[in-house]
Amino acid sequence: MSNNVIIFDTTLRDGEQALQASLSVKEKLQIAYALERLGVDIIEAGFPVSSPGDFESVQTIAREIKNSRICALARCVDNDIDVAAESLNIAEAFRIHVFLATSALHAEHKLKKSFDDIIEMGTRSIKRARRYTDDVEFSCEDAGRTHIDNLCRIVESAINAGATTINIPDTVGYTTPYQFGGIITNLFERVPNIDKAVISVHCHDDLGMAVANSITAVQAGARQVEGTINGLGERAGNCALEEVIMAIKVREQMMNVQTRINHKEIYRTSQLVSQLCNTPIHANKSIVGSNAFAHSSGIHQDGVLKNRETYEIMTPESIGLKEVQLNLTSRSGRAAVKHRMEEMGYRETDYNLDSLYAAFLRLADKKGQVFDYDLEALAFMGQQQQEPDEFVMNYFNTQSGSSTVATASVSISRKNEEITEAATGNGPVDAVYQAISRATGYPLKLVTYQLTAKGEGRDALGQVDIVVEYQGRKFHGMGLETDIVGSSANAMMHVINSIWRSEQVEIEKRKHHTTQEAV
């Protein structure tokens, strides 16, 4: 048996079914290119008979992608198979994937056919698909709830008919790892021609066990895993391919299998899919979540600084991230604060660690996460970090509509001076940002803008989190109001005042160094 596990991605087919709006052909091609760079073996590009748009997408991807084999889905219906072949025939080699429900529940209530009829339908469709290609996959839909005797019968018949890959889906995420592994083991023990096909698995996550079921199946002999990037999919989603891939890599010695995936493309691919599909990745998502390699506990931070393997079973670099992230919070220890100061180029003689750490804890209790510019302000400005903001928003007004250019005016106080400015923008938020930039004199570049709802209904608060770049440094801001534009304005004012403090830090640092040189 081969030690290579084939990675079959169905983000563009099964994953897209979960989206409120379909992806465009251009967007699907972007994802296909990313999957090709990732090293995915099989890309299921769509269900061509379902719509002209899906047909065009599959055809375009089949024409453009050269290093991954393109696959199209078809029911066990002659026209489905013919249309799938037509969409794929531009490629040098391709796969047709036919599926048919095999559980008693589906046979009785959906198909209304006997199991003998189902076997006949499946074998006939496989033979038809083999007219177009020698790479045919057959899926036993709802295999997880199919009686094992029937499952063995149809798998044997499908292989005899010419299927080169047999897929065993846990369509509704019903099985447990022990049970699902047992199904795969039974197939290998009871199907006499099992060695003539690759056994594949396709697990859904309704009970949160899609990845565990897939890994157990590989240990039982399956050599293809199907899933989607970020676990995208209907209901609770599909098996998250990035998790399976990294599980195989991290536990390679135990599992004795590998993939041909370029692991350093994982994070980049995940971010692209999230962006194009408009599906945010949860911070605690395994492998690709923003907290996956972030350490906040002081004990953990101290351990990671001494030896990363104490609390990291894989490196962020292994998935394409640059470095480990130590989040400075009230749970961080002195070692993490000292390390961050060293990373910024400061020596212990430049500041008093005891005083800095005490001030850091006070700020962290109040603010939550402390950033580099906050730390510098504490080190070189002391209590000035706690003083009132330099710039204060008095009011803002916006005007926008479908037939007018968005405009905004702002009034900002700086000490005893009132500054008023107006600007236009690409929407009311952008107009406010342009006006704030003019009023304060800071040319800003918005890097990220994230809006999340806090609560429900008319009284829900809109939290705006932004990252802004100024002179090569990134500054974070947060605003929280029922009015989204107001939240956005507050977030930007937060940034403006952080930038001003960072400038005062530079002034204090120069004074500090001048004093040291004089001594």
Curated annotation (Swiss-Prot):
Principal location: cytoplasm
Residues binding Mn(2+), per UniProt: 14, 202, 204, 238
Gene3D superfamilies in the cross-refs: 1.10.238.260, 3.30.160.270, Aldolase class I
Keyword vocabulary terms for this entry: Amino-acid biosynthesis, Branched-chain amino acid biosynthesis, Cytoplasm, Leucine biosynthesis, Manganese, Metal-binding, Transferase
One Pfam family matching this protein: HMGL-like
SUPFAM superfamilies: 2-isopropylmalate synthase LeuA, allosteric (dimerisation) domain, Aldolase
Spans through the membrane: none
GO biological process terms held by the UniProt record: L-leucine biosynthetic process
Catalytic activity: 3-methyl-2-oxobutanoate + acetyl-CoA + H2O = (2S)-2-isopropylmalate + CoA + H(+)
Location of the region described as Regulatory domain in the Swiss-Prot/TrEMBL record: 392-519
Alphabetical list of PROSITE patterns matching this protein: AIPM_HOMOCIT_SYNTH_1, AIPM_HOMOCIT_SYNTH_2, PYR_CT
Subunit composition and interactions: Homodimer.
Name of the protein in its database record: 2-isopropylmalate synthase
Top-level taxonomy: Bacteria, Pseudomonadati, Pseudomonadota, Gammaproteobacteria, Enterobacterales
